[in-house]
């Protein structure tokens, strides 16, 4: 059965003008995306985003402002749902306590997720896997005029 799948993601840019990217393994696939995930029933968008950052990064974030909502049809890569993704600019409340990798898909043996900072000056849409994330990168680069 087809259904809507509401997702919420955070665009976190640090003081070094780098954006946080999450590399993940799931369902036999590897992919790169912005941190975030699915909205749960009864949850608000900002609360979901804060929960996702806590689950994925063990980090508390402050949601700054809405950045983008999907304005085109996107089929899920994992099932027959239609994806609706909402992106917010966020900032960390405290410095992230993560091990950052320097290359994509550099997973430790016991994990299916790794994080890396990408310089905005080097950021390209192909840095991420899914079309909605690529669109966000294009918009982000236009906004910061790189």
Predicted features along the sequence, with ranges:
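Conserved N-terminal beta-strand and adjoining loop/helix that marks the start
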Residues: 1-19, 64, 85, 89
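A generic structural micro-feature
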Residues: 2-4, 31, 78-84, 107-112
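Short loop segments at secondary-structure junctions
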Residues: 14-17, 25, 91-96, 120-122
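Conserved Nudix-box catalytic region and its N-terminal flanking loop in Nudix hydrolases
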Residues: 17-55, 59
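Nudix hydrolase/Nudix homology domain
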Residues: 29-32, 98, 103-146
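Internal catalytic or translocation cores that form aromatic/hydrophobic pockets or channels
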Residues: 50, 67-72, 83
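Active-site-adjacent beta-strand/loop module that shapes the phosphate/pyrophosphate-binding cleft
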Residues: 74-101
């Amino acid at each position: 059965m087809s259904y809507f799948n509401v997702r919420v993601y955070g665009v976190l840019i640090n003081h070094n003008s780098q954006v946080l990217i999450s590399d993940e393994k799931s369902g036999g696939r590897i992919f790169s995306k912005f941190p975030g995930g699915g909205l749960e029933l009864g949850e608000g968008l900002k609360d979901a985003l804060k929960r996702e950052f806590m689950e994925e990064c063990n980090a508390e974030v402050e949601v700054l402002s809405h950045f983008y909502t999907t304005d085109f049809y996107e089929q899920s890569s994992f099932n027959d749902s239609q994806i609706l993704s909402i992106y917010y600019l966020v900032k960390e409340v405290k410095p992230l306590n993560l091990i950052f990798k320097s290359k994509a898909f550099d997973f430790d043996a016991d994990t299916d997720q790794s994080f890396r900072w990408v310089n905005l000056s080097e950021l390209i849409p192909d840095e991420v896997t899914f079309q909605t994330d690529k669109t966000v990168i294009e918009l982000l680069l236009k906004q910061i005029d790189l």
